[in-house]
Swiss-Prot record:
Record has Cytoplasm as a keyword: yes
Lineage, opening ranks: Bacteria, Pseudomonadati, Pseudomonadota, Betaproteobacteria, Burkholderiales
Entry's Gene Ontology molecular function annotations: homoserine O-acetyltransferase activity; homoserine O-succinyltransferase activity
Record-given protein name: Homoserine O-succinyltransferase
Domain of life: Bacteria
Pathway(s) per entry: Amino-acid biosynthesis; L-methionine biosynthesis via de novo pathway; O-succinyl-L-homoserine from L-homoserine: step 1/1
Gene that this polypeptide is encoded by: metXS
GO biological process: homoserine metabolic process; methionine biosynthetic process
Catalytic EC class: transferase
């Protein structure tokens, strides 16, 4: 929820910021049926909102997060003035997703480590953290949980459900699981399923965690340690896939950390230093069990599987209008993966707009400032606002 006064240490809140925000914790006592056949009961979801829900409850937009993000989509966290929302350049007054017009909701998914119930939470059956006992969750499970959040707000239909990367998969799942509950589906830098190569990257990352001596079968909390070495390597692997070769060449090239080579196995190149820094930073704040869960959810997502692998048949049940966006240098989820979604929609004669943005920053481009990209998003949301009278 948005406050009006800046927190201590923040002298100036930008006029296009949603301001200082404090999340709310929603508790759900009714069991949630999971895709794996089990249930989870008495769980919490962290939720953050921006803007005002109109009387008709038609101006709500759900923003779904990617692997290491959370409910904190925009604004300044009340408990940490340096914590700016992960999509702050997209969401706010006068921004592409304009909170003067739309009521924006961010939900932290089950299994995460940012306040929603996950492996770090207390298992009511044991009184200890769930750890490895936390059930494997899927994109579909997250969407079902998000639908319960919508119910609490009295939202029958979202003006849009939007996400990038893994968030885009959730948006896509919304269009299939609750086709009548969203007017528009915005899928950015995403894919209808992971390729074998992407599953392989995830497996190497998970293996680095599982082989860390401090992992203790996922119950490292009881040992008061974290498998930081494995998590560090996992993040380094993932980070490489988020950047383009062009971007890495421009940022680092073959620049050395010292003036000359030292003929050692310590850090020699600037790119090595960068990756180690990113890995170290990630290992300090992220949870290894959560990393395992979320990467496995990525692997499992494949809406065409129930339709004999035919994405066109899978997409036949959609009712929303679509905006699909890809980036030329994204090799994690390359443009051809977005075009698969577009083709399936066109085959079903569904309304879809598609843009392939020429950007040098690889997969991470969906999070960065780019005038063409943001103008496109702004224009699409202007259209939605006109439809609903926002």
């Amino acid at each position: 929820m948005t406050d009006v006064a800046p927190p201590a240490g923040v002298l100036d809140v930008p006029t296009d910021s949603v301001g200082v925000v404090t999340p709310q914790r929603m508790h759900f006592s009714e069991p949630l049926q999971l895709r794996n056949g089990s249930q989870i009961a008495d769980y919490d979801l962290m939720v953050e909102t921006y803007g005002t829900l109109n009387a008709a409850r038609t101006n709500a937009v759900l923003v779904c997060h990617a692997l290491n993000a959370s409910h904190h989509v925009a604004g300044i966290a009340a408990d940490n003035p340096r914590d700016i929302g992960w999509w702050d350049n997209m969401v706010g007054p006068g921004k592409p997703l304009d909170t003067n017009r739309f009521f924006v909701i961010g939900v932290n998914n089950l299994g995460s480590c940012f306040g929603s119930t996950g492996p770090m939470s207390t298992n009511p059956s044991t009184g200890a953290p769930y750890g490895a006992l936390f059930p494997v969750v899927t994109v579909e499970d997250w969407v079902n949980a998000q639908a319960r959040v919508a119910d609490i707000f009295g939202i029958q239909q979202f003006a849009a459900v939007m996400g990038g990367s893994l968030g885009g998969m959730q948006a896509l799942a919304w269009s299939l699981m609750y086709p009548e509950r969203l007017r528009h589906c915005i899928v950015v830098a995403s894919t209808p399923k992971l390729s074998a190569q992407n599953i392989a990257f995830n497996e190497v990352a998970r293996s680095s965690i599982l082989s860390d001596p401090d992992f203790h079968g996922g119950n490292y909390y009881a040992h008061n340690v974290k498998p930081k070495r494995g998590l560090r390597v996992a993040r380094m692997i993932g980070h490489i896939t988020y950047l383009s070769d062009e971007d890495m060449a421009e940022k680092f090239g073959r620049s050395l950390k010292a003036e000359d080579i030292r003929f050692s196995f310590d850090v020699e190149f600037q790119v090595e230093s960068y990756l180690r820094y990113q890995g170290d930073k990630f290992a300090e704040y992220f949870d290894a069990n959560t990393y395992l869960l979320i990467t496995r959810a990525l692997d499992y997502f494949d809406p065409a599987l129930a339709h004999g692998g035919d994405l066109t048949r899978a997409m036949a049940q959609t009712q929303a209008g679509f905006l699909v966006v890809s980036f030329t240098t994204d090799w994690r989820f390359a443009p051809n993966r977005s075009r698969e979604i577009v083709k399936a929609l066109l085959d079903n004669k569904r309304p879809v707009s598609y843009a392939e943005i020429d950007a040098p920053h690889g997969h991470d481009a969906f999070l960065l400032d780019d005038a063409r990209y943001h103008n496109l998003m702004r224009a699409y949301y202007d259209r939605i606002a006109e439809e609903i009278g926002a």
